[in-house]
Amino acid sequence: MYIQSLALTSYRNYEHTELQFDNKVNVMIGENAQGKTNLMEAIYVLSMAKSHRTSNDKELIRWDQDYAKIEGRVIKKNGPLPMQLVISKKGKKGKVNHIEQQKLSHYVGALNTIMFAPEDLSLVKGSPQIRRRFLDMEIGQVSAVYLHDLSLYQKILSQRNHYLKQLQTRKQTDQAMLEVLTEQLIDAAAKVVKRRLTFTKQLEKWAQPLHFGISRELETLTLQYHTAIEVSEASDLSKIKNSYEESFQKLRDREIDRGVTLWGPHRDDLLFFVNGRDVQTYGSQGQQRTTALSLKLAEIDLIHEEIGEYPILLLDDVLSELDDYRQSHLLHTIQGRVQTFVTTTSVEGIDHATLKEAEIFRVASGKVID
């Protein structure tokens, strides 16, 4: 798939902009704070219905306007697919093929994108929350069912935490309701964890040979989904539920004392090992960057395996963060397969072969010249 055109209305520092893209490589050149990253973000928001930079949608709306609109014409193997996302202070509404989607979870997945920005290098060394978000965003692109299960889990978790807080402060004394909420939470949690376990194994399958190649055949990358219960990728839903039920029995009194849920996928993590050693703790900066790059490149093949089409790759000021060898490996891996968008302050450092086939856009003060 690829984006043929993009139109922005009142988005960030863009008043109104319409662009036509090359189906291979598009390079956005400009000084910092001119709007390059805003363009990349707009493509990502069109795809995911949320920003990778902020959780406050109001920041996406031009300061003097009431709403922002992103429109794109996506070309897929079955033909063109118009998409539209309107962001207002009341919320977001998405259309796919001119049909308004009742839920954003139905909207997400029509356009698949992979964002690789400097902050993604913290995927390995950052907090578990970053890695959980990575799992949720990437699985959500290929599974609307997962987004539904995750949303349900988060809703029940909030209700359960509220009830635990009431038990803690003696505003409630009936633990029967806690049992009901726990049963519901276990059911939702098991589905979320099962899908994450499967995804982790799929991601490892694609990331392992990539990492081996980038490391000049010196390093073997393995992934582990870390959860407090005894489960594996081979565990079925009933085994996962049984493990959670045992955890609840052990932790119930502590949870009431603390007024919060102490188990579940909202506390899990994704771990990375190179030659058996934890990369986050013991890996060099080079190993951490190779791991992050391998994961991002692996997503391309994983999504292709799941949906039969390659996603769009967004490289936002990340090439300058990679040494020549890793940059060359990245560009060689994607060449000719994936529509790619690159932002940079200068074309220096981007290899000649990539520039030769690229469409060049110059960005300044919210204006784009091609």
From Swiss-Prot:
One of its GO terms (molecular function) is ATP binding. ATP binds at residues 30-37. It is found in: Cytoplasm. One of its GO terms (biological process) is DNA replication. Keywords: ATP-binding, Cytoplasm, DNA damage, DNA repair, DNA replication, DNA-binding, Nucleotide-binding, SOS response. It comes from the Bacteria. Transmembrane segments: none annotated. The keyword Chaperone does not apply. Signal peptide: none annotated. GO terms for cellular component: cytoplasm. Belongs to the RecF family. The RecF protein is involved in DNA metabolism; it is required for DNA replication and normal SOS inducibility. RecF binds preferentially to single-stranded, linear DNA. It also seems to bind ATP. This is DNA replication and repair protein RecF. It comes from Bacillus pumilus (strain SAFR-032). The lineage of its organism: Bacteria, Bacillati, Bacillota, Bacilli, Bacillales.
